[in-house]
């Protein structure tokens, strides 16, 4: 057993929940804490920054509206997870327990709150997820990635931002260059794991409607899901320069090189666009729970850093018109890029760690908020 103070971080077993937890864990370890992860069995293929001794798999389940038997099973799994969490906390004696979303955070955070441990949750989106909505009542603090501080828990909400990768921070150093004259116009399209197929259909249809001189300047980079060969063939027939792939290792760099981005509005996408500072057309995924993507996009649009169009209102003609407008107004895109960058939160990982340490030593959240506000204003 180590003499270091123990912090337990809980996260759902998907990359979206685990990445911010891992980023904060690395930062807290550098500050001398012994950090453990509580998650579910899905996490094995995503976890990168924890060794086996520091990963604790607990029972959990997602609430559904299906058969009553499913509800009984869910309650049983959550109760089992609470028992496992209780045993773990008696063993580790954590000074802080933090949650990063997903139902596996529910048992440990509830148990920690009733044990009167210091607790926090991190909400990536502008709208709280279902597990976090319940946990918000019990925890000591709420760290907001995109969540407004003007919510019903404003007294304990601190705007920290969402942790972004180091490659994103490096890309943020690259200034935005408008495409003027006959310079190439770099157009980046990505849809994340949800709804990329919509872009695979509508983007080439829109490109076909553009004037020849615009198509000649276009340099397309498009992330797709399963339509790669067909899309490459379509762009080749139109004589449009395009790179099409299911995944790009250097996505942050490609974002930085782009003049315009077409994207969904997941929390990580919106935050990376803002930190790097690029103009974007955001199409919220219409089937997202709680319509969180629409709320995420609205935050960037409100400051003039992006445009929003719902999927049902976007067709090939509309997209072609918007692309033509973007070509003809390079300095307007430059203004959008600057507006987006002003609301980016590049120091989110450090701020989350700062907030965690403040909670451990009993500092008031109002002091933490004031400190972060002064940093933003500087």
From Swiss-Prot:
Its EC number is 2.4.1.227. It catalyses: di-trans,octa-cis-undecaprenyl diphospho-N-acetyl-alpha-D-muramoyl-L-alanyl-D-glutamyl-meso-2,6-diaminopimeloyl-D-alanyl-D-alanine + UDP-N-acetyl-alpha-D-glucosamine = di-trans,octa-cis-undecaprenyl diphospho-[N-acetyl-alpha-D-glucosaminyl-(1->4)]-N-acetyl-alpha-D-muramoyl-L-alanyl-D-glutamyl-meso-2,6-diaminopimeloyl-D-alanyl-D-alanine + UDP + H(+). UDP-N-acetyl-alpha-D-glucosamine binds at residues 14-16, 125, 165, 193, 293. Pathway: Cell wall biogenesis; peptidoglycan biosynthesis. Belongs to the glycosyltransferase 28 family. MurG subfamily. NCBIfam families: murG. The gene is murG. Signal peptide: none annotated. GO terms for biological process: carbohydrate metabolic process; cell division; cell wall organization; lipid glycosylation; peptidoglycan biosynthetic process; regulation of cell shape. It is a peripheral membrane protein. GO terms for cellular component: plasma membrane. It is found in: Cell inner membrane. Cell wall formation. Catalyzes the transfer of a GlcNAc subunit on undecaprenyl-pyrophosphoryl-MurNAc-pentapeptide (lipid intermediate I) to form undecaprenyl-pyrophosphoryl-MurNAc-(pentapeptide)GlcNAc (lipid intermediate II). One of its GO terms (molecular function) is UDP-N-acetyl-D-glucosamine:N-acetylmuramoyl-L-alanyl-D-glutamyl-meso-2,6-diaminopimelyl-D-alanyl-D-alanine-diphosphoundecaprenol 4-beta-N-acetylglucosaminlytransferase activity. This is UDP-N-acetylglucosamine--N-acetylmuramyl-(pentapeptide) pyrophosphoryl-undecaprenol N-acetylglucosamine transferase. Keywords: Cell cycle, Cell division, Cell inner membrane, Cell membrane, Cell shape, Cell wall biogenesis/degradation, Glycosyltransferase, Membrane, Peptidoglycan synthesis, Transferase.
């Amino acid at each position: 057993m180590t003499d270091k103070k123990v912090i337990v971080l809980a996260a759902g077993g998907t990359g979206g929940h685990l990445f911010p937890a891992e980023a904060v864990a690395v930062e807290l370890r550098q500050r001398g804490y012994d950090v453990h992860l509580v998650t579910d069995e899905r996490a094995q293929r995503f976890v990168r920054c924890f060794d086996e001794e520091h990963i604790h798999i607990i029972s959990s389940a997602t609430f559904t509206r299906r058969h009553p038997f499913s509800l009984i099973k869910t309650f049983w799994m959550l109760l089992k997870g609470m028992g496992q969490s209780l045993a773990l906390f008696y063993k580790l004696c954590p000074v802080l327990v933090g949650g990063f979303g997903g139902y596996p955070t529910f048992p440990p955070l509830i148990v920690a709150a009733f044990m009167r441990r210091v607790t926090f949750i991190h909400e990536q989106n502008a709208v709280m997820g279902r597990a976090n909505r319940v946990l918000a009542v019990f925890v000591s603090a709420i760290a907001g990635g995109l969540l407004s501080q003007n919510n019903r828990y404003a007294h304990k909400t601190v705007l920290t931002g969402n942790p972004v990768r180091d490659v994103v921070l490096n890309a943020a150093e690259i200034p935005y260059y408008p495409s003027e004259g006959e310079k190439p116009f770099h157009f980046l399209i990505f849809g994340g794991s949800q709804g990329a197929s919509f872009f695979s259909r509508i983007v080439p249809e829109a490109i076909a409607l553009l004037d020849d001189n615009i198509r000649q300047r276009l340099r397309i980079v498009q992330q797709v899901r399963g339509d790669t060969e067909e899309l490459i063939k379509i762009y080749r027939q139109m004589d449009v320069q395009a790179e099409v792939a299911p995944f790009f290792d250097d996505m942050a760099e490609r974002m930085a090189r782009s003049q315009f981005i077409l994207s969904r509005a997941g929390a990580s996408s919106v935050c990376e666009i803002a930190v790097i500072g690029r103009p974007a057309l955001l199409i919220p995924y219409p089937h997202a729970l709680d319509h969180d993507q629409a709320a995420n996009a609205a935050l960037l649009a409100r400051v003039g850093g992006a445009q929003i169009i719902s999927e049902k209102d976007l067709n090939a003609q509309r997209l072609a018109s918007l692309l033509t407008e973007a070509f003809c107004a390079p300095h307007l895109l430059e203004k959008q890029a600057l507006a987006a960058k002003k609301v980016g939160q590049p120091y989110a990982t450090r701020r989350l760690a700062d907030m965690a340490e403040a909670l451990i030593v009993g500092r008031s959240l109002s002091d933490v908020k004031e400190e972060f506000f002064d940093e933003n204003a500087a």
